[in-house]
Amino acid sequence: YSTQYIIQIGVIEIESNKKDSLFWNTNRLIPLTIEESADYSRKDSIYTVRNSKKYLDSIDAKGNKFKLGKVLTGYTFKNSAEKYSLSYEGLLNIGSLSFNTVQGYNFDSGFRFTSTKNQESKGIYTAVSTKFNYGFAEERLRVTGQFLHRFNKMNYATLSISGGSSVKQFNPNEPISKVINTISSLAFRNNFMKLYNLEALAISYSQDIANGVHLNGKVEYQQRKPLFNNTDFSFLNKSDLYSSNNPLDLNDFTTAPVDKHHLTKATLNARINFGNNYSSRPDGKFNIRNEKYPTLYLGYEKGFASNEKKYEFDHLNTRLTYDLILGSKGVLGLNLKAGKFFNAENIAFMDYKHFNGNQTHIGQSERYLNVFNLLPYYSNSTNNSYFELHSEYNDKGYIMNKIPLLNKLKSTLNLGFH
């Protein structure tokens, strides 16, 4: 990893904004004009007022008013002077309402505490949150919690501890959104989302270990349990049948896709931004990715300490992403992935490598560099070696702007290969 092309684009020294007028009169090459001096003085006065405790408390007092209805809709208490907030999502968190055939209708609520007291000077950030999820068809409440602490914004050292009970898709990338699955299930009885129960406790740590190099390590204890359909409800197409919750056999409603078991997983991932530039300020180091160079991801995953030896495995993986800028002719995006499993002949299905498919045929992103839009979700899942390629060309108007009438639409041409 060469540092030849690393550039520090800018630097602001510590407490440079606290120098007195004598310092600036001595070191400023070109004196400020009268208008500039007046403008700086005015802005300093405004900043002082708007950051005073009296002003901040008055603003908070208006937003912090509590009404009984907030129990249902949610409530946030802010203390801007002390730089912390406490939020509650409410019992009627309509935005979280969704449907799947395991839980039926389900919704989330929760609490979250955040503190940014030393954010400006040191970049310290702390968040403690808990989420409650209730499934009506299951009649079951699941609870998860997380503690997250960022130590600074120089190397972005971050510690996270999380745990609890939740439902998870077999593909950890979760290619099927809750909204899309709700619509496809209730309107068309296409329940593409397949779920299992996860009870876990995890600790992770990440930081920049060199310019452009970010490292993340995680150890997680997991207990996995199979789940089955608990509802047959839909609005339309009631004569059709839902598929089972078994991604290995959609017509098998009695056999579990996995047996109940536990496993400890350790992962180590690195991200390398080649040619990474950055800017230094008193409150942190801010990375500026150099678009001339690709980004490389390296990963190692190990499953161990299981109740059955067959679930243990090793998995090496890598990914390369790159946007080739073609000047006025557009952009060619690339996403290459490869990996290999070892000692993984009988591992659990959720530990397989799953490829992001899309059986709903509804696009969910502006670019399709991480999805196969015609692939069934679990048809090509593997516990062996694999290679994956996505490429997409966007002409940025280079071709479309030359076609009469179509050029009036300001549209772009996209061509993909997967």
Features from the language model and the residues they span:
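Gly/Pro-enriched, hydrophobic low-complexity segments
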Residues: 1-19
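Transmembrane beta-strand segments of outer-membrane beta-barrel domains in Gram-negative
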Residues: 20-103, 110, 175-328, 414-416
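Transmembrane beta-strand segments that form the barrel wall of outer-membrane beta-barrel proteins
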Residues: 84-99, 115-117, 122-147, 161, ...
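Repeated loop/turn-to-beta-strand initiation elements of outer-membrane beta-barrel proteins
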Residues: 117-126, 153-159, 212-215, 225-226, ...
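Short, surface-exposed basic-aromatic patches at helix termini and helix-loop junctions that form
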Residues: 147-153
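Long amphipathic alpha-helical scaffold regions
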Residues: 153-163, 169, 236-243
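C-terminal outer-membrane beta-barrel translocator/porin domains of Gram-negative envelope proteins
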Residues: 158-179, 183-194, 255-256, 297-401
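Membrane-helix boundary/juxtamembrane motif in polytopic membrane proteins
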Residues: 403-413
